Amino acid sequence: MSLIASDHFRIVVGLGKSGMSLVRFLASRGVAFAVADTRENPPELATLRRDYPQVEVRCGELDVDFLCRADELYVSPGLALATPALQAAAARGVKLSGDIELFARNAKAPIVAISGSNAKSTVTTLVGEMAAAAGKRVAVGGNLGTPALDLLSDDVELYVMELSSFQLETTDQLGAEVATVLNISEDHMDRYSGLPAYHLAKHRIFRGARQVVFNRQDALTRPLIGEGLPCWTFGLSKPDFKAFGLREEDGEKYLAFEFQNLMPVRELKIRGAHNQSNALAALALGHAVGLPFDAMLAALRTFAGLEHRCQWVRDLDGVAYYNDSKATNVGAALAAIEGLGADIEGKIVLIAGGDGKGADFKDLRGPVAANCRAVILMGRDSDQIGEAIGDAVPLIRVGSLQEAVEQCRATAQPGDVVLLSPACASFDMFKNYEDRGHQFVRIVEELA
């Protein structure tokens, strides 16, 4: 049964993908609601007017009096809760909520909840494939692919959800069967006052969780939990009790659980130490919800990774080209640089730059010095990255992605990797990170 009172009035704030899923959900349950968006022509406006012509919609500057007609506002993750109109409505007693809170109230099957600064999509997809291999009727989505409310179904046996900090801000009680924060590094500092505020938002994922998984090599991922709550860890160190990790025997490295070797690392199709960590995180989450190891390992052996996430493009003249356009923050770029750097004989020629979202790039310097032959810089905040790296390696500034790839080809030597891992968002030069990745792949594939 839907846990939503139908005699109250709601307003959906934000008419993008998640906003439209809220519209469909509320309409299907006969709830009275309206829609507001700060944009004059939001992405789903035509769809709303075609399918729900009776729904009142206000576009442009948010009207506080209009918002205060509602008992509850469902705020899309793209809109900051610090927006003055939202704060004014909250001060007058209007509840601020979101689609994930509504999803959690209505989901009947167990939820695997996954957040983190990086690798969320890879681990979410992997757990979904593990569940499918085990014969479960699984629904995968949230911040990845299908909006959460569109997944609700009585047929689903397990939900695997990727959740962003923005989605978690409006989620009071998720009540996941198992929850994890994979890693935490600076991201979205244009939306948060600092790392502590971002950390607090991420940790809302643990509210009401029945089990937790955390990264034992990243103290910021460890939740404050009560006694008796089942807890599993993952990391690249040797595992002990209730832990997943790496164990080496006779020169062979294995994914392992406690004191049991599960499979050789060389059987993974996904490259780099960061992807070994992702595999271990997925195993921990799957184990927590009772997935058998044979099904999980079968899924791991066939998983080739996701587009734009350390995606192999081609080998040319002894140089491998990788598209990691999804690396829109420093932590993601570091994972790729250090993960691939430990896995290759040569060096990395890195393409970096774009919209830095207020990040501090100083943490790039050491890993770049250790793993890179050169860095090709482009985009709005390329000078900030250049200042952070300093004289650690040669820096080459370019005006386009085409020029960046050409410089990489001229610089790289056999055994090297050319890596697009920008450490920045893409909106200064591209439609989105997918557009940036697709252009990179096209340019690389056109190299003679």
UniProtKB/Swiss-Prot annotation:
A Pfam family this chain is assigned to: Mur_ligase_M
GO molecular function terms listed in the Swiss-Prot or TrEMBL record: ATP binding; UDP-N-acetylmuramoylalanine-D-glutamate ligase activity
Catalytic activity: UDP-N-acetyl-alpha-D-muramoyl-L-alanine + D-glutamate + ATP = UDP-N-acetyl-alpha-D-muramoyl-L-alanyl-D-glutamate + ADP + phosphate + H(+)
Biological pathway: Cell wall biogenesis; peptidoglycan biosynthesis
Annotated localization: Cytoplasm
EC number of this enzyme: 6.3.2.9
Binding, ATP: 116-122
Family, similarity comment: Belongs to the MurCDEF family.
HAMAP family: MurD
Function (record text): Cell wall formation. Catalyzes the addition of glutamate to the nucleotide precursor UDP-N-acetylmuramoyl-L-alanine (UMA).
The protein's name: UDP-N-acetylmuramoylalanine--D-glutamate ligase
Organism: Pseudomonas fluorescens (strain ATCC BAA-477 / NRRL B-23932 / Pf-5)
Lineage: Bacteria, Pseudomonadati, Pseudomonadota, Gammaproteobacteria, Pseudomonadales
